[in-house]
């Protein structure tokens, strides 16, 4: 392929038969190794093109690998594909299924929406709820678990099971299957049909897997069966970059590979061609705190590079401002927009940097597309409170927040009020069936709304959350949904942050609309060539590289994230992935206050030898 291989790469490429585990650290040239190995198998006549299967996780990665292989004068006939595409091919060969059987994403969401509407469930966050159901369904299927024993998060168990049964009935009735079925049905078929199993085991003499640390149980079991006859399973991955536990991916299969295949050869690609020595050495200091891992002792190619920098800002807004300044300076120095990235822990953090770059006229790309916080139901609730305080005749606003927190105004009373000729608030007060204690709740709401009206949007929202009790409502809602209230509180915090310097409700509402519109425009750019500074989550940054990387808000509760503290090793891997995206420049930062609360420096800073405490005191 025109590239000189180092000793470890050569060892992996020249391996002939039997299982092999290639531990490939960041920037170590794993794709080159995979492609060179395929070319060598063909050159040495160990296999014909059609006897080789190369598997990866995304269609883009599979297409790129195939393109590079053909550019290197590789012959046609080698199978490059995703797990889903290959498993569907196996199912199609048995059942003759066409692609029209496969549920498209929007189609299956519509089906679930219809099921929920038929059941007359009151779901305040329908789209999020549907996403959560499918995310938990995928997790269950990837673990090959039964719905009878699976314990979902973010959705009550009984609701999950009812939806699951209705969804399965719909698929059966309409002869449909989704992406999860491709894994589970393929596993069943390979497990139960000896003829099919023998055919596919004979078909592929050599199987190569990229990003092996990301396999889930269903994928691994299918792989194990397919490779059983020839045992030429060549897997490439890095346990230190296993960051998709929420999808069922586990580093265990990689870590236990030598146990599952005692005759497996193991080689470590520990030369990072991407990052400078300084970046590599700091990243190593962090990741070596994980106990469950293979030691790799990553090294660079001798370029020490710029010092990794650190600064402490007062709060998120100041941090974003400082990063904005540094980005402007990099652009002046000739660093291209597309070679700069701000990588944060959660989607919520992106707003501050988007606002700052927008203000400076610096183009940016929001690379994660998972929801618009400014259109989240919590944002809509909070805005509804402010609008209702301004104008008691906002019937839509009152309907929205009437029982948030509980005021025990039931559907029957609401229906009765809606037959009256007045606005909804007044109608409720004059309903003949209104009980004294319900009237008291309404009086309290009216009094509270009067207080809110006299305050700035920021102080008004604080009153809604702390005095009226909206935060307690979020806590109850989270408990019912088997999820963390922290995430919902942080959304409310972010909306309050947006209100900070708004003089009135009109200005606040306009700001929410503008920010929401910016996110919609970014979403429409999906799939287009990137032209701006990349703003993305640590999960979204996997597999990418940049000359300059900023890692903001390195404080406890954010990095590592509050909800990831039980899985501290996964949080550390996530931070390691983020650090190793940097080629030349890495800038770390922390904040003294987040959403008005004092913070503590991230433990990862101490692990890399930075005494951040002295900055904080």
Predicted segment positions?
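Accessory C-terminal helicase-associated subdomains
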Residues: 431-540, 561, 612-616
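Helicase C-terminal subdomain and adjacent C-terminal extension
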Residues: 593-617
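A basic/glycine-biased coupling hinge at the interface between accessory DNA-binding modules
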Residues: 17-18, 28, 39-190, 194-202, ...
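Conserved helicase core region in the C-terminal RecA-like lobe
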Residues: 79-87, 208-211, 236, 507-565, ...
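ATPase/helicase motor core of nucleic-acid motors
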Residues: 260-261, 304-307, 333-457
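Helicase P-loop NTPase motor core
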Residues: 26-34, 263-265, 270-363, 389-391
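Conserved RecA-like helicase ATPase core segment
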Residues: 2, 7, 36, 40, ...
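Hydrophobic anchor at the beta1->P-loop junction of P-loop NTPases
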Residues: 22-24
